[in-house]
Regions:
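Active-site helix of classical SDR
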Residues: 91, 127
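Active-site-adjacent segment of SDR/Rossmann-fold oxidoreductases
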Residues: 116, 132, 137-147
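Residue(s) in the substrate-gating loop at a strand-loop-helix junction
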Residues: 111
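The beta1-alpha1 cofactor-binding region of Rossmann-like NAD(H)/NADP(H)-dependent oxidoreductases
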Residues: 9, 30-41, 73
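C-terminal helical subdomain
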Residues: 151, 169-184
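A glycine-rich helix->loop->beta "capping" turn
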Residues: 22-25, 45-58, 64, 103, ...
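Substrate-binding pocket helix/loop in short-chain dehydrogenase/reductase
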Residues: 67-68, 72-77
């Protein structure tokens, strides 16, 4: 659910079922990344189950698109809490684990709205540019611990972009088209 209220974990549960059907192991948690305690619980459950954490993909998101004049500070804060602070919470909670392991891979998702701007997305653009600054600094800090961090600014047809992109284009922009870059 893109509203940011009463998040829906069904998509993650579906992915868990798909992974398990192929013989893999997976776990869904449904943490609200804007809540540090929920993120810490999610990471603790991951460590309890597998004993290590190798990869983090920061990809949670919501939209509150309005021109800057019409948008509220509350919506601005909500968007930055999920996109920027959610990335901070997840990365901070995993960072020392990865450093201690001397191995970790972190992906943050940015957006062309953060890199170039997009009308009505001041809050989103600010958050997405913020994760770029974070990534650039952490790439330097993590290098000596073999913790690598990269950013993607993908365009994909997702639950968040459904209804914003032409139906024909949406059908071509599957998340699977972004997967090779995430796995790099």
């Amino acid at each position: 659910q893109v509203s940011g209220e009463g998040a829906n974990s069904q998509a993650s549960l579906d992915v868990v079922a798909e992974i398990e059907a192929l013989g893999g192991e997976a776990m869904a948690h449904g943490a609200n990344v804007a809540d540090l305690e929920q993120v810490q619980d999610m990471v603790a459950q991951t460590m309890d189950r597998w004993g290590r954490l190798d990869i983090l993909v920061n990809n949670a998101g919501i939209l509150r698109d309005k021109s800057f004049s019409k948008g509220s500070v509350e919506d601005f804060r909500l968007v930055t809490d999920v996109h920027l602070m959610g990335t901070v919470h997840c990365t901070k909670t995993c960072w020392d684990i990865m450093k201690e392991q001397e191995y970790g891979r972190i992906v943050v998702t940015s957006s062309s709205s953060g890199l170039y701007g997009n009308f009505g997305q001041t809050n989103y653009g600010a958050a997405k540019m913020g994760v770029i600054g974070m990534m650039n600094t952490l790439a330097q800090e993590g290098a000596k611990y073999n913790v690598k961090i990269n950013a993607l600014a993908p365009t994909a047809g997702t639950r968040m972009t459904e209804g914003l992109i032409d139906e024909n284009a949406f059908a071509l922009l599957t998340p699977a088209t972004v997967t090779p870059a995430v796995l790099y």
